[in-house]
Design a protein with these regions (language model features):
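Hydrophobic/aromatic residues positioned on beta-strands within the core alpha/beta folds
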Residues: 90-92
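The C-terminal output helix
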Residues: 127-145
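Charged docking surfaces used in two-component/phosphorelay signaling
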Residues: 24-28, 32
Length: 145
C-alpha cells in the first residue's frame, strides 16, 4: 500500500495541540508525506501563525488550557479573508460523541477527526477539504494498487 504524499512544501499545514507528543507525531507523519508543517502549542500562538504564514489548513485539538480550539477557530473565522479568516480547519479531538462533533462544526471547523488519530483518515480528510491536496491525492494510485 502506497501512502498518499504531496510534493514537498506544496501543502502548508498548521498543527495546534498543547501536547508536545501529539504535535511531534502529527508533524513528523505529515512532513513524511511531503507537507510543510508548523506546530503551535496554544491557540494564541496559532492565531499569530495563521495571520503571518497563511497555512492551507489548521489541524487543532479542541481541549487546550486557557483557550480552546473552539475559541481559536471562532476568532479565526472573525478575521478578514486575507488575514486567514477562511482557512479550513479540522478538529482533532478525543471528544468523539455526536454532540462533540456538532459543537466543533458549530464553532467553525470543517471536519472532525477523533483521537487517537487514524493517519489515513486524517490524510483523506485533508484531501477532501483542501482543493490542491484533493487534486494531488486523486492523481496517486489507489491504495493497495
Amino acid at each position: 500500500m502506497t501512502p498518499r504524499t504531496w510534493p514537498r512544501s506544496d501543502l502548508k499545514l498548521l498543527i495546534v495541540d498543547d501536547d508536545p507528543n501529539t504535535r511531534a507525531l502529527l508533524s513528523e507523519a505529515l512532513e513524511g508525506r511531503g507537507a510543510c508543517v508548523r506546530a503551535s502549542a496554544s491557540a494564541r500562538e496559532a492565531q499569530c501563525t495563521i495571520m503571518g504564514w497563511h497555512p492551507d489548513l489548521v489541524i487543532s485539538d479542541v481541549g487546550m488550557p486557557r483557550e480552546s480550539g473552539y475559541d481559536l477557530i471562532r476568532r479565526v473565522r472573525d478575521l478578514p479573508a486575507d488575514a486567514g479568516g477562511r482557512t479550513p480547519a479540522i478538529a482533532c479531538t478525543g471528544y468523539a460523541r455526536a454532540e462533540d462533533r456538532a459543537r466543533a462544526m458549530n464553532a467553525g471547523f470543517d471536519a472532525v477527526v477523533a483521537k487517537p488519530v487514524d493517519l489515513e483518515l486524517l490524510v483523506d480528510t485533508i484531501a477532501q477539504i483542501v482543493p490542491h491536496a484533493r487534486g494531488l491525492a486523486a492523481a496517486l494510485p489507489p491504495e493497495g494498487a
